Amino acid sequence: MHITARVDYAVRTLLEIARAPQADKAVIGATAVQVAPVVKAEAISTAQHIPPKVLETVLAELRRADLVTSRRGPDGGYWLARPAARISIADVIRAIEGPLASVRGERPEDVRYPGAAEPLQRVWIALRVNIRAVLENVSIDDIAQNRLPGFVETLTADPGAWARR
């Protein structure tokens, strides 16, 4: 699997926003609510070493996917559109690059092979199932809190996981 620079930047952007200090509570009516931290693009760019123009594009894609919200002006910036625990790495990849797995630009279930290659479609489907198993079950919050799911820790504890092949 190839993780593009834009996906890497998008995940790091969301992590930077998720880790921002929480703002004070605001009182709306009779209820105190936590105000989401607002993070400026410049702060994200500096903290994560993301080129500003690239970050601008990434933030626009995250906004279109309803993963972040923004406000202009001197008090403006970006904040998560929903709790970090409800944003999976799969959500981020889909927002930036589209489907998690594709074959020649098509979804695996839409690819057909003749003759001896016919079983290959099932291999691509199985690959997608396994990619989903990890990416849909790891959230921005899991990473921000350095609290990866147990199955991820188990997979990465195997020395073979780190071997280049």
Label each PLM-derived region with a short phrase:
Residues 5-51, 78:
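N-terminal helix-turn-helix DNA-binding core of bacterial DNA-binding proteins
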Residues 46, 63-64:
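Alpha-helical residues within the helix-turn-helix
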Residues 66-80:
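Beta-hairpin "wing" of winged helix-turn-helix
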Residues 84-109, 121-130:
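Conserved segment of winged-helix/HTH DNA-binding domains
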Residues 109-165:
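C-terminal regulatory/oligomerization modules of transcriptional regulators
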